[in-house]
Amino acid sequence: MANDFLFTSESVSEGHPDKVADQISDAILDAIFAQDPYSRVAAETLTNTGLVVLAGEITTGANVDYIQVARDTIKRIGYDNTDYGIDYKGCAVLVAYDKQSQDIAQGVDKASDDELNTGAGDQGLMFGYACDETPELMPAPIYYAHRLVERQAQLRKDGRLPFLRPDAKSQVTMRYVDGKPHSIDTVVLSTQHSPDQSETATKMKASFTEAIIEEIIKPVLPSEWLQDTKYLINPTGRFVVGGPQGDCGLTGRKIIVDTYGGACPHGGGAFSGKDPTKVDRSAAYAARYVAKNIVAAGLARQCQIQVAYAIGVARPMNITVYTEGTGVIPDAEIAKLVAAHFDLRPKGIIQMLDLLRPIYSKTAAYGHFGREEPEFTWERTDKAAVLRAAAGL
């Protein structure tokens, strides 16, 4: 990639229909794990006008009121009024869970290559990434896109901008100079609002746009990056119909929002609703943990990790490191350090990151990475000093 370029990432709020689905799926996972942390869970959710459908495969000893979990999640997000197209009290919730296939379970319970370990729950490839663009070691565009919609929800819930409704999307276009963030070229923020805020694009009140820029955007984005920045606020002019009424929501349909905003490849597997025997989730978390510790150790300014698995096999097919020329030692040497200091077998990942806990609801909105939450063990940099010493730095 050229040293001077524009790069864009987007995020969506907790009220976006796909994120509603993700949050319900992870709330169900947490409710199950609170009783039985060895459950096998693949909880999928569909949301539409006045309707929630829960489906997937669950094998558990837990006794969970799935319908109530779904309603509680919708309430917490803020869909508490029939005018919003879905409300927690009156929406229909359909439940259609099966048990995990025994064909899959036998390969997960005992790995074909390591009888003392668990096998991967599926084949697949996963990526982790870290870079020095922000203190959280995340790419700046996705990091700030998350913070914008997070602030939208905060101001909606605390009543400072009472005309806001739950659905919102943000997009940040960053200008890079010499390969580093220089300024923000464009900010797009579309937020659902009450009907009285605008009737047509030409009648949109200036006070609405001003409130979004002054109360949401400017408090979040670094002022030194706001140089001739273009602001596009509700570009269609009206955003009253939103959430599951505006679009059908599905679990796992915001995988780029959930990860790095397109700054690195994605293996295609979603996270929400999946227990950590599913390497789509746990190995992606582990790959982030590895990449973040490599950058924190000063071994590279940016680091991409790829791991891949075969179903029923414990050991990854490959561990590949790519630092895009920023590494202080060869990528192959960093990969050897990773293999020596991180157990990337499924059971090893679960133990290393303490994943058999009801910690997943927090991950389901505003990004799985780059957030200093105590539950997010994959954000620790506790291996940085060890890696640095092992590299001889």
Swiss-Prot record:
Catalyzed chemical reaction(s): L-methionine + ATP + H2O = S-adenosyl-L-methionine + phosphate + diphosphate
Binding-site positions, Mg(2+): D18
Renumbered residue ranges of the record's region Flexible loop: 100-110
Subcellular locations according to the entry: Cytoplasm
Keyword DNA-binding: no
Binding, ATP: H16, D167, A168, K169, R238, F239, D247, R253, K254, A270, K274
Keyword annotations: ATP-binding, Cytoplasm, Magnesium, Metal-binding, Nucleotide-binding, One-carbon metabolism, Potassium, Transferase
Disulfide linkage: none
GO terms for cellular component: cytoplasm
Listed cofactors: Mg(2+); K(+)
Main location: cytoplasm
Pathway: Amino-acid biosynthesis; S-adenosyl-L-methionine biosynthesis; S-adenosyl-L-methionine from L-methionine: step 1/1
Amino acids binding K(+): E44
GO biological process: one-carbon metabolic process; S-adenosylmethionine biosynthetic process
Cofactor remark from the record: Binds 2 divalent ions per subunit. Binds 1 potassium ion per subunit.
Record family assignment: Belongs to the AdoMet synthase family.
Matches recorded under NCBIfam families: metK
Name recorded for this polypeptide: S-adenosylmethionine synthase
Lineage per the UniProt record: Bacteria, Pseudomonadati, Pseudomonadota, Betaproteobacteria, Burkholderiales
